[in-house]
């Protein structure tokens, strides 16, 4: 049975994740006008694009909301972000620069805590600003149902009646004015921005075009480090970790993890650290592009991985990177609380993170330009005294030991040579193999045939769309498409 409502449930309470922007404001007013009972829930996630988050719920009252609540999600979001950091749960990277999954982290927390707040008020229907082409519609759906199995979903922007009447910013603003309701006429930006305490996402509109670069974005957590007119002074910073958690910055301990992250953001931000331009694969396997900021997470990540490399052996590092990447994709898909994710997360936090204790000093310059000045810790596996190229009093092994070790390698080298000789005899090396294998085998059995041009386009095309589908597709939502 579908949990998604396609028409307004008149007479019932509907919870709306309320941002105070044009789209959610008009949605609340329209639902009240049409007979539903809107209740708004605003998440305080430390978002840098809303400096006065405390005032947002009061705005909802003016549009007819029966319940207006501000839910403080910052502590939970910081904790989940620290867990992701300890696990290296970041799977998207370009040119060595990672995306720190800051939006998926935020959705896991808000999608859970807002629905729980609604449940306390007896609200069983939930709506948010995610569009049907993006990731968030599925993330919120999964987390919402995990928090409340009886939840039903209503999104005005998937309701043909709503979109017919209020399909774009112009129609929305005119509707509010016609009904005597306040309208904050903010300037429409060339791209959409979504932020929380861990980072900011810039996407959609002009940024969908790959000939538009990162330099068109105005950072909200950092500075335009690419602009030579922006003065950025060199700065040294020391970050301390204990058992996989950051505990100090420049020797200072903080009253809460939230305060520590805010300080890390401030330091990384004034250097433009942690900005990246990514092409990624959405949940639905369509590619999208985003420009991301995460100055504090980037700073902590540099320090954490420096310590991880100093402490753990090669196989542990391989597991950390491989499983961390898998966990990052699960989080991206809205599966951060699924059993398979919890299993990976617990293993990495327990066997990788808890051993990570130490301090790293960095010299920050512009953007990703930094130097590591010092690395200290009580349990490093790095022992230069044992492997020095100079004469040492107590080396780990001597030349005769190494000769013996090399001799023991003869067996596996011989095995490798034997396999290569066998492959030559079979025609796998040096000559075409007489028996088709791989794609050639599939072609020989008829599973892969002629591939005429244009087939991929035919598969991806939706065909002739109905008027209603076209209208929903063109609905202009200022929240973007993530």
UniProtKB/Swiss-Prot annotation:
GO terms for cellular component: cytoplasm. Pfam families: Arginosuc_syn_C, Arginosuc_synth. The keyword Membrane does not apply. Its EC number is 6.3.4.5. L-aspartate binds at residues 131, 135-136. Residues 461-482 are annotated as: Disordered. Pathway: Amino-acid biosynthesis; L-arginine biosynthesis; L-arginine from L-ornithine and carbamoyl phosphate: step 2/3. CDD domains: ASS (cd01999). Its main location: cytoplasm. It is found in: Cytoplasm. The keyword Acyltransferase does not apply. One of its GO terms (molecular function) is ATP binding. ATP binds at residues 17-25, 43, 129, 131, 136, 194. It catalyses: L-citrulline + L-aspartate + ATP = 2-(N(omega)-L-arginino)succinate + AMP + diphosphate + H(+). L-citrulline binds at residues 99, 135, 139, 192, 201, 203, 280. One of its GO terms (biological process) is urea cycle. It comes from the Bacteria. Keywords: Amino-acid biosynthesis, Arginine biosynthesis, ATP-binding, Cytoplasm, Ligase, Nucleotide-binding. Transmembrane segments: none annotated. Homotetramer. Belongs to the argininosuccinate synthase family. Type 2 subfamily. This is Argininosuccinate synthase. It comes from Streptomyces lavendulae. The lineage of its organism: Bacteria, Bacillati, Actinomycetota, Actinomycetes, Kitasatosporales.
């Amino acid at each position: 049975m579908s949990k998604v409502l396609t028409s307004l449930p008149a007479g019932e309470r509907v919870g709306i994740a309320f941002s105070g922007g044009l789209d959610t404001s008009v949605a609340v007013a329209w639902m009240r006008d049409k007979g539903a009972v809107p209740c708004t829930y605003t998440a305080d996630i430390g978002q840098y694009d809303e400096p006065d988050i405390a005032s947002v719920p009061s705005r909802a009252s003016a549009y007819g909301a029966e319940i207006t609540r501000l839910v403080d999600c910052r502590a939970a979001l910081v904790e989940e972000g620290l867990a992701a950091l300890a696990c290296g749960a970041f799977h998207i990277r370009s040119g060595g620069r990672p995306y720190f999954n800051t939006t998926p982290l935020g959705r896991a927390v808000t999608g859970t805590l807002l629905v729980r707040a609604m449940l306390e008020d007896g609200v069983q229907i939930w709506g948010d600003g995610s569009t049907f082409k993006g990731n968030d519609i599925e993330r919120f759906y999964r987390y919402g149902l995990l928090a409340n199995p009886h939840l039903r979903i209503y999104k005005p922007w998937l309701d043909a009646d709503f979109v017919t009447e209020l399909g774009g910013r112009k129609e929305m603003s005119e509707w509010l004015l016609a009904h005597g309701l306040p309208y904050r006429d903010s300037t429409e930006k060339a791209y959409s921005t979504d932020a929380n305490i861990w980072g900011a996402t810039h996407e959609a509109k002009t940024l969908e075009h790959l000939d538009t670069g990162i330099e068109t974005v105005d950072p909200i957590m950092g500075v335009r480090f690419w602009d030579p007119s922006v003065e950025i002074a060199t700065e040294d910073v020391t970050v301390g970790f204990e058992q996989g958690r950051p505990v100090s910055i420049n020797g200072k301990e903080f009253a809460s993890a939230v305060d520590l992250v805010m300080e890390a953001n401030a330091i990384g931000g004034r250097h433009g650290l942690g900005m990246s331009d990514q092409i990624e694969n959405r949940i639905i396997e369509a590619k999208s592009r985003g420009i991301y900021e995460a100055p504090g997470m980037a700073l902590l990540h540099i320090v954490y991985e420096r310590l991880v490399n100093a402490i753990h052996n090669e196989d542990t590092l391989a597991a950390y990177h491989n499983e961390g990447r898998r966990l990052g994709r699960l989080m991206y898909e809205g599966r951060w609380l699924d059993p398979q994710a919890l299993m990976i997360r617990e293993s990495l936090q327990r066997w990788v993170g808890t051993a990570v204790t130490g301090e790293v000093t960095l010299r920050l310059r512009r953007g990703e330009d930094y130097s590591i000045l010092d690395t200290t810790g009580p349990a490093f596996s790095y022992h230069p005294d044992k492997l020095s190229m100079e004469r040492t009093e107590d080396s780990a092994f001597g030349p005769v030991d190494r000769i013996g070790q090399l001799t023991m390698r003869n067996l596996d080298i011989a095995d490798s040579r034997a396999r290569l000789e066998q492959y030559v005899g079979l025609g796998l090396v040096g000559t075409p193999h007489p028996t088709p294998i791989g794609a050639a085998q599939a072609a020989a059995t008829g599973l892969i045939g002629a591939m005429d041009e244009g087939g991929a386009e035919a598969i991806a095309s939706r065909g002739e769309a109905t008027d209603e589908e076209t209208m929903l597709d063109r609905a202009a939502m200022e929240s973007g498409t993530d």
